Amino acid sequence: TTLHNYNRHDLQNAMIYSDNIYFAKAALKIGKDIMKDQLDNLGFGESLDFTFGLNASSYGSEGFTSDIQLADSGYGQGKMMVNPVHMAAIYTAFLNDGTMLKPYLIKEKRSKKQILKENVFTKEAVNTVNEAMRQVIRDSSGTGHAANIEGVDLRGKTGTAEIKQSQTDTKGTEIGWFVTIMPATNNKEALELVSMTENVKKRGGSGYVVNKTKKIMEEYLQ
């Protein structure tokens, strides 16, 4: 049963309210084989060619061994381990018609974008998710609404990573994160900002990160 009271149970509202139950059900509907194939397509289990060594993102060495694990993985828990740099690369696809860009540490003048993986999402999927992320910030009920800046096309998604030893561990901490993307404007290049803060359990969860992100964006846009 969903924990959020909203009328239309679809992807857009699930994104707006960050509804874990919706995504758990979606994972079960998709099934473990398609879930695995799509995560592999995004680069899970692969090392990133980066300036320094990075751990590969993973959904567990044995795959999805139960429906419970599959459902939990649908909203980023279970055995999901996502490298933040890899996460940033995945989100670049929503600014590049479904193609992931290769991340690098130092900005240099380049003749063209360096591509990590082409066409990981269809253009239809990109448009659908972009509109949902836009509403995460614009909608007054959105978990990212505190980052809304009037007249600026910001899109985002909040998240919370639980750090605990077991399902019954009540003393574990939480990492709050917020990914924000902004298409290119007349005077600013396209931007993606991935903000992560440790130990947000008693500081408002990912909402703490959203407020910090708005300050950064306002400074950038001056």
Label for each model-derived stretch:
Residues 1-195, 205:
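Beta-lactam-recognizing serine transpeptidase/beta-lactamase-like catalytic domain environment
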Residues 113-117, 210-222:
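Short, gly/Ser/Thr-rich active-site loops of penicillin-recognizing serine hydrolases
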Residues 197-211:
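A short acidic/glycine-rich loop-to-helix N-cap element
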